[in-house]
């Protein structure tokens, strides 16, 4: 009589568990929270003076750059750019529906 063959269970669709015992449950990661910026919505005299003296010296002037450097909100930065353009201290390079790019006004004489 031939020796008995070990019965191999048919392959199942479920993956085999590696290791025995209970596995640790995966913990939910706590979502990252952005730090809230406390930007000004109105100019005070010190910030306005800083805008008038420093902004015309920037090579690239956009609302986001003014907002970041002067701690003012975006709508105030757009108004400040408009004010600087009226005074002639900066000039427009390009405009887009969502962004305006300006630079310092240089004399071409």
From Swiss-Prot:
Region Disordered, residue ranges: 1-36
**Molecular-function GO terms, alphabetical:** structural constituent of ribosome
Sorted alphabetically, the keyword list is: Ribonucleoprotein, Ribosomal protein
Q: Does the keyword Nucleotide-binding apply?
A: no
> Where is there biased composition of kind Basic residues?
22-31
Pfam families under this entry? Answer: Ribosomal_S25
Recorded hits in InterPro entries, A to Z, give: Ribosomal_eS25
Q: Output the Gene Ontology cellular-component terms.
A: cytosolic small ribosomal subunit
Which cysteines bridge via disulfide bonds? Answer: none
Q: Which family does it belong to?
A: Belongs to the eukaryotic ribosomal protein eS25 family.
Q: What's the name of the protein?
A: Small ribosomal subunit protein eS25z
Q: Write down the species.
A: Arabidopsis thaliana (Mouse-ear cress)
The gene designation is: RPS25A
């Amino acid at each position: 009589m031939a020796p008995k063959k070990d019965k191999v269970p048919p392959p199942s669709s479920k993956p085999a568990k590696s290791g025995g015992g209970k596995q640790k449950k995966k913990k939910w990661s706590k979502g990252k929270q952005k730090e809230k910026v406390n930007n000004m919505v109105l100019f005070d005299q010190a910030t306005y003076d800083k805008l008038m003296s420093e902004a015309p010296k920037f090579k690239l002037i956009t609302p986001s750059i003014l907002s970041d450097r002067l701690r003012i909100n975006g709508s105030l930065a757009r108004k400040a750019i408009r004010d600087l353009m009226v005074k002639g201290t900066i000039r427009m390079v390009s405009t887009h529906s969502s962004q305006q790019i300006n630079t310092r006004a240089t004399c071409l004489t």
